[in-house]
Amino acid sequence: MTPADLAELLRNTAAAVLAERGLDAAALPATVVVERPRNPEHGDYASNLALQLGKKVGANPRELAGWLAAALAETDGIASAEVAGPGFINLRLEASAQAVVVTNVLDAGDRYGHSDAQSTHNINLEFVSANPTGPIHIGGTRWAAVGDALGRLLSTQGAGVVREYYFNDHGAQIDRFASSLIAAAKGEPTPEDGYAGSYINDIAAQVLRQAPDALSLPEPQLRETFRAIGVDLMFTHIKESLHEFGTDFDVYTHEDSMHTSGRVDQAIARLRETGNIYEKDGATWLRTSAFGDDKDRVVIKSDGKPAYIAGDIAYYLDKRQRGFDLCIYMLGADHHGYIARLKAVAAAFGDDPATVEVLIGQMVNLVRDGQPVRMSKRAGTVITLDDLVEAIGVDAARYSLIRSSVDTPIDIDLALWSSASNENPVYYVQYAHARLSALARNAAELGLIPDTAHLELLSHDKEGTLLRTLGEFPRVLKTAASLREPHRVCRYLEDLAGDYHRFYDSCRVLPQGDEQPTDLHTARLALCQATRQVIANGLAILGVTAPERM
């Protein structure tokens, strides 16, 4: 019996008890919360349903809890139901009911934990979207890991998800990039506002290999040649780095296309129809302050050129026209102002501002022995995705970046994350999977096959803890997807790995010496097989490998 099964049982029992006593069953919440007590002595699960309902139905919460506990105690699978404090209900499950989760996991396989909770959503998930003026920096690397994991997580809950990279190839930064390449090709110093790093010299050399006569071209053609070829080369490198990191996108949208295709003009025309565009001081303004922004925004500047937000407006409309009902933007720490701005754009088009969700990621620092690390020569003073992968590997890099809430700055200790020790969280989880894989190989050599026929024998405390943790996985995924918090999957996996290691140290799984295999051995083997499956499922969501050997 999983927590979801128990919650449904509790709700149905409460509905029957309330009806029997002439109380209002309509007061029942749509979702009943069942949690594991911090103190295992209080039971396997606990609920505060009676405390929630008491006042609503005109009953004393503790008395109501007593009615519910009495009814639950008569239910198959419930070993005991007791009232605690002002109206909590503590529940213990029978071993056979608790162990059903093993069968659930093995039957579902790599789909265990999946649901249709987000199936009504068609989501555009935009992340990374770094400027094509240099390698992916460490902040963008965090989004590459978290965004990819979030996309996988939302997919497990039934959402349609398109992962999208918005390619910022329009504007002043591209002009500075081209100027930097030209200076490098000529052997001149980097312009004052230009881009530095050996990658600029590398790209400039590649441009000259593709266009040997570029430096002899007139200025407009010279600049366009270095801009076009340089941006293409840089973006190719970015995509290769992301692919090697395990992050790929379904769609790449070019900002420049918003302007050259006329979509900016079309979007502004649509906004004029809503009455939310006006002219002032020779410029064209969007009335965003009417929709929660701190001020109105210039859309077309007085010189006739589109402001930066013009591209954002066209891009939002483009997403909606492609059929997305939810647009998630993952932005850097310096983009807090964009939250109100993007929601105001949605509202100006007549959409619910909730159509837009903005996640803001905080800073990432690399440390070794407590001291900041400066690594990259290729990108000047910037730490890049490639630097991090070179230092600790793809798995550790992804896991370390996903493991903390995105609104929390993080320090990545390179010594810790590259160590083969239990203090390294990704090693700890992966080692549990490798240990389980070795156990499966050893069992096969003995001719033992996991068997779910006698799961009621799994009555040891450590077995019970492991079973309950396995049962939590679907709820963890559902909650993590709903809150857009893939770090919850990391923390769950660490708890599961810990529960498994403690179980393994206390409960012998395989027969030793001349000992004959028993039903308990094969039941424990089934429990181990289920644990291995759930760890693999969780790591897959994170884009981290589940090694067979370590």
UniProtKB/Swiss-Prot annotation:
It holds the Pfam family Arg_tRNA_synt_N. It is found in: Cytoplasm. Its EC number is 6.1.1.19. It is an enzyme of class 6 (ligase). One of its GO terms (molecular function) is arginine-tRNA ligase activity. Keywords: Aminoacyl-tRNA synthetase, ATP-binding, Cytoplasm, Ligase, Nucleotide-binding, Protein biosynthesis. GO terms for biological process: arginyl-tRNA aminoacylation. It catalyses: tRNA(Arg) + L-arginine + ATP = L-arginyl-tRNA(Arg) + AMP + diphosphate. It comes from the Bacteria. A motif ('HIGH' region) lies at residues 130-140. The keyword ATP-binding applies. One of its GO terms (cellular component) is cytoplasm. Its main location: cytoplasm. Monomer. Belongs to the class-I aminoacyl-tRNA synthetase family. This is Arginine--tRNA ligase. It comes from Mycolicibacterium paratuberculosis (strain ATCC BAA-968 / K-10).
